Amino acid sequence: MARETSINKYRNLGIMAHIDAGKTTTTERILFYTGVSHKLGEVHEGAATMDWMEQEQERGITITSAATTCFWQGMAGQFDKHRINIIDTPGHVDFTIEVERSLRVLDGACLVLCSVGGVQPQTETVWRQANKYKVPRIAYVNKMDRTGANFLRVVKQMHDRLKANAVPLQLPVGAEDTFKGVVDLIKMKEIIWDEETNGLKFEYGDIPEEMRAQAEEYREKLVEAAAESSEELMDKYLESGTLSEEEIIAGLRQRTIANEIIPVLCGSSFKNKGVQAMLDKVIELLPSPVDVPAIQGVNPNTNETEKRESTDDAPFSALAFKIATDPFVGTLTFVRCYSGVLEAGTTVLNSVKDKKERIGRIVQMHSNSRVEIKEVHAGDIAACIGLKEVVTGETLCDVNAPIILERMEFPEPVIAVAVEPKTKADQEKMGLALAKLAQEDPSFRVHTDEETGQTIISGMGELHLEIIVDRMKREFKVEANVGAPQVAYRETIRESVEQEGKFVRQSGGRGQFGHVWLRIEPQEPGFGYEFVNQIVGGVVPKEYIPAVDKGVQEQMQNGVLAGYPVVDIKVTLYDGSYHEVDSSEMAFKLAAAEGFKLGARKAKPVLLEPMMKVEVSTPEEYMGDVIGDLNSRRGLIQGMDDELTGKVIHAQVPLANMFGYATSLRSLTQGRANYSMEFDCYNEAPNNVVEEVIKSKSK
């Protein structure tokens, strides 16, 4: 089946924003104007089409990036039919992983900003991620009808805070409750949208006299920005002082795709003004799949780098960027097809796992309603039903042309809590539910703590884990109690000792006799456990030696200070004795355990606590508060770097003092800082911590 839309008329578009910038309403309007959605869903009524999970409707924040396909021919029908695949991305800091996933598969993005709040904390985070993936973008300043709306202030903030080369393509006509339209600086006309038809109709008019001087000033900046795209245009501009509309668009397009400028538009999505013109600019200025560099990957057989061009003739390759569980069809695997054609019913290779998978049905999504399709072409986004083993970030490709497209990197979880089902009957259901949720979301992990036996879930923040527990209840009908997080302490020793260990039971009948001498010594941190046998002359028969090793290792699981595992020690068995009849493996195991326990008590035992490597990115004005807070958490500041939007602080902080950090950092910096945390090493805990830990263990 031939493709319906040629690939140069595709736009894979991400809508990025901070919470409350009006992103979901903007997406709704796009669906309305492109003819997909006939009733406008408002977020504050909890009915938006893109927000398809119940918790999102309650909280009014977008959690899952839903992928939607729509078509656009221009506000005045001036274009050929273009296909726009929209990926809606969440704006909450705990969901940055979702944003990373969607940015990875986009060709271009539209950043939605609030005309009152301007560049907000999460905007900076999302901006950094878009820079990382070099995503060309335009900006849309929304909510121009709100009290305090100020378009040019937001443009200045983009320059100052995001270091963006922002180029306004429009100016607002009026603001707050008098906002009625925009001045198009390319056409030098006013655009007024018709309220009767919810903005489906519009008229061009002359620029209001009082705005003419300002419009001419900004038009000149715009033409200059376009002229800088090539020497040819610059020469023409210098000679004639202006450029044609076509030349301006061509120059702006080239520089937008090269990430040299950010064209800025404005409007009020809620009042049905501005989204239509923004869609026109998505078509005119943002890249199609063939305008961005061909994706590169590694051939797993040769380890050579290979390219995949965005054509239907190339071997099939696609990236799985999201897994979702649908109550009716099971697992949906969202894929971005980079090259070739994928047909329903064919077998493909998961090159990361080197496993073949059969593609069952393929669907395209409009929010959460589905249209079944027979094949997916290069440049398209769709969801496959029935893939068993694929997880987010893996590559699907032609069986005869294996390639691993760039692997997505997922941040380590930063917060962990223990969960237990409210009833015994829910135990198995909880395990299945958590496994499904972990498959959908690589930033969420589940493991069983061997020491406490608890199920520990970890994720990107408190809200992230709240929503996981919430989804277990709603989707899998499992109620869980959530405990306080546990820290995995360890113990070791600081001195060498020699210790006798004896186990004797000799009161009638067959007795038990085991007798050992152990030398117990500390090792370098991270060296682990070492057992040395120095028995000579058979004073301990060799068949009992493994039992001695086993007895020591079992006792090491239960340290003498607070019952935590003992690490980094060397144990040497150098002497002992045995009884011809009464000795046994069990007796020597128990003798060794006793000897180790007594010896460890004399060898200056210490408690070790996990230390985390913490990096905080913060605007400079909050740096003092952030450092003060890290110091109060027994943190050791190890250095600082400059970055575009502020400072990066490097510190080492005990894990026990990092709980609740996401929340307190958010309130310290009004949410403008973000942080990453990973395990660094174990360090000796100070006395006050040791006392607290021993006290809490003995309760």
Curated annotation (Swiss-Prot):
Residues 8-290 form the tr-type G domain. Disulfide bonds: none annotated. One of its GO terms (cellular component) is cytoplasm. One of its GO terms (molecular function) is translation elongation factor activity. SMART domains: EFG_C, EFG_IV. It holds the Pfam family EFG_C. The keyword Membrane does not apply. Catalyzes the GTP-dependent ribosomal translocation step during translation elongation. During this step, the ribosome changes from the pre-translocational (PRE) to the post-translocational (POST) state as the newly formed A-site-bound peptidyl-tRNA and P-site-bound deacylated tRNA move to the P and E sites, respectively. Catalyzes the coordinated movement of the two tRNA molecules, the mRNA and conformational changes in the ribosome. It is found in: Cytoplasm. Keywords: Cytoplasm, Elongation factor, GTP-binding, Nucleotide-binding, Protein biosynthesis. GTP binds at residues 17-24, 88-92, 142-145. Belongs to the TRAFAC class translation factor GTPase superfamily. Classic translation factor GTPase family. EF-G/EF-2 subfamily. GO terms for biological process: ribosome disassembly. The gene is fusA. This is Elongation factor G.
